[in-house]
């Protein structure tokens, strides 16, 4: 609605009037402040400021209580420091006493105090029976002392249990003395079986048998001569026939001279070519 009114207002102005309106800041400010949206924003702003002021005034009412709580917190913190220092001092004293005194000493002292309070209660009961104490004072004092006696008796029993446990634990936890191994005769360790190791069996090498003796008139083999055993293999000596006599030369017995062939050595012959096997349907020529 306000936008339509503004458009209608600006539509009736000429170009010169529009230029003058742009140059006049005061008139533009009045026009903006007169708009409904600007008035709504201003109203919300004033209401927000008023609510903030009221909240601030309400918070100021709690200022005395806040100051009192701060002072109380400071006092409690100082008391805490004092108590902590006292705790540290007492803890140090207790540690020194616990280091100096053992459980047996504490047990003896507590038993002495327990016996003393028991004796006091018995004496009080005798005085009451003799009529030296009135009933009212006897009931109050006797009840408190009997309560203290029972508490000390329970503490003595608990402390005795602790002492017994402390005596048992070191004995149970002490390691046994080391055992000195007795000397034993050195025995050869058996080798593991071949089935357990999975290795193939090794057969020892046999010694070759000696060759048979060579009778007279036989020739020794080169193997026997290389072994140097003095034993030769039995190979019979070769009996070669005598060579035929040549014309004009005397005949000779045995192998006095090396036989020389009058013919040149034969050349090595090439082996014949291999023929393909006979196959049906082909004629070989």
From Swiss-Prot:
Keyword Protein transport listed: yes
Protein name: Vacuolar protein sorting-associated protein 37B
GO function term, MF aspect, one: calcium-dependent protein binding
Biased composition (Polar residues): 250-259
InterPro entries, alphabetized: ESCRT_assembly_dom, Helix_hairpin_bin_sf, Mod_r
Gene Ontology biological process terms from the UniProt entry: catabolic process; positive regulation of viral budding via host ESCRT complex; protein transport; viral release from host cell
Lineage top rank: taxon: Eukaryota
Assigned keywords, A-Z: Endosome, Membrane, Protein transport, Transport
GO cellular component terms attached to this protein's record: ESCRT I complex; late endosome membrane; midbody; plasma membrane
Domain VPS37 C-terminal residue range list: 84-173
Keyword NADP: no
Job description of the protein: Component of the ESCRT-I complex, a regulator of vesicular trafficking process. Required for the sorting of endocytic ubiquitinated cargos into multivesicular bodies. May be involved in cell growth and differentiation.
Binding partners and assembly: Component of the ESCRT-I complex (endosomal sorting complex required for transport I) which consists of TSG101, VPS28, a VPS37 protein (VPS37A to -D) and MVB12A or MVB12B in a 1:1:1:1 stoichiometry. Interacts with TSG101, VPS28, MVB12A and MVB12B. Component of the ESCRT-I complex (endosomal sorting complex required for transport I) which consists of TSG101, VPS28, a VPS37 protein (VPS37A to -D) and UBAP1 in a 1:1:1:1 stoichiometry. Interacts with CEP55. Interacts with IST1.
Membrane topology: Peripheral membrane protein
Subcellular location per the Swiss-Prot or TrEMBL entry: Late endosome membrane
Compositionally biased region (Pro residues): 173-184, 206-215, 262-275
Pfam assignment, any one: Mod_r
PROSITE patterns xrefs: VPS37_C
Stretch list, region Interaction with IST1: 50-170
Species of provenance: Mus musculus
Annotated region described as Disordered, given as residue ranges: 167-215, 242-285
């Amino acid at each position: 609605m306000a936008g339509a009114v503004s458009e209608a207002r600006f539509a009736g102005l000429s170009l010169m009037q529009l230029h003058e309106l742009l140059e006049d800041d005061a008139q533009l400010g009045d026009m903006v402040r007169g708009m409904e949206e600007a008035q709504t924003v201003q109203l919300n702003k004033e209401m927000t400021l008023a609510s903030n002021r009221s909240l601030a005034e309400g918070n100021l009412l709690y200022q005395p209580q806040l100051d009192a709580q701060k002072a109380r917190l400071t006092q409690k913190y100082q008391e805490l420091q004092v108590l902590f220092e006292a705790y540290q001092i007492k803890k140090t004293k207790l540690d020194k006493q616990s280091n100096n005194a053992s459980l047996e000493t504490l047990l003896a002292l507590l038993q002495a105090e327990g016996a003393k309070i028991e004796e006091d209660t018995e004496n009080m009961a005798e005085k009451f029976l003799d009529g030296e104490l009135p009933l009212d004072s006897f009931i109050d004092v006797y009840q408190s002392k009997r309560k203290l006696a029972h508490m000390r008796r329970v503490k003595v029993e608990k402390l005795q249990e602790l002492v017994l446990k402390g005596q048992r634990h070191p004995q149970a936890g002490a390691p046994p003395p080391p055992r000195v191994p007795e000397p034993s005769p050195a025995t050869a360790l058996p080798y593991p079986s071949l089935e357990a190791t999975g290795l193939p069996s090794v057969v020892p090498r046999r010694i070759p048998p000696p060759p048979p003796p060579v009778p007279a008139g036989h020739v020794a083999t080169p193997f026997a001569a290389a072994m140097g055993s003095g034993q030769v293999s039995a190979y019979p000596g070769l009996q070669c026939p005598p060579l035929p006599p040549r014309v004009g030369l005397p005949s000779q017995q045995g192998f006095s001279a090396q036989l020389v062939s009058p013919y040149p050595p034969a050349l090595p012959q090439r082996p014949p070519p291999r023929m393909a096997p006979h196959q049906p349907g082909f004629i070989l020529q």
